[in-house]
Amino acid sequence: MMSYKSIMQTFLILFILAVSLQPSGSQSEMADDDLEIIEIIEPSWLLVTTISPSYSSDLVADFKALTGSQEFPDHLMAEDAEKAEGDFDVSLYFTVLDRLSMTGGRVLDYVYDYAGIGGAPVLYARKAVAPPYRNYSEYIAADSAVKPEVREDYYLRYIETDGTPEGFFQLALLLIQGEQFYQFWHAAYNDDAIVSDLEDARASLGGGLFGADEPTVEALLADLGKFDLAPVVSMSGDLVKVEVVIFTDWGGFVRRSIVMEKELPHLILEERSEVLVPYDCGIMF
């Protein structure tokens, strides 16, 4: 049996070991400080440009006009639907997005993804000399090792800007609203639309299928008046950040920030969203 003295000596040794294994207060604080530094580091944006609200508003309106009058073709309402002659031609986008161009001998095209409870186009870039994919299944099978959500922005690799702030704003517009045509049922939840000023915001709230009543519109606009809605494009070294305010019937007014590579291919590196003024139309379908 151990003596009282032996027990106390053993306890003392264990206590010393336990204390020695704990990180010191300064070490813990240093680790926390390091984590904070990592979280707040951002590029020093050397060139920050506010896009004219009149320019951006007119551009968005012209872009919407390309697809706004398109009627949904009955032949697309089926799984593995195939496009037909006379369906919308997405190459028309470049008549409005005049600071963008296709590269690498590619053209912009789309297949239609119909799934019973919803349907929407999926943009992709193909070689101009290659035949288009017949349907969505053929598109998926062409690169089955890659999940569709991973390659949803692949087409951007073949779209080049002219390097100006307006060019990168046009690229963001294509990314946000480029697949908003021939939307069926649940796909209509993808309704993000860029707004550039309070006039755009009012039109967004009062228009569409789910327009808000006048008191609600005025209250929301009063809250939104605290913010500058004009798009902003920031550049630094090999990075570009595009910030726009969008409106959605299922979320309200949201500032979206997109960081991408300045040089081709303009890979999307980060996307963030911040709700400025919340709103929900209350419609579910």
Per-region residue spans from a language model:
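Bacterial N-terminal signal peptides
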Residues: 10-20
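C-terminal, beta-strand-rich globular interaction domains
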Residues: 230-285
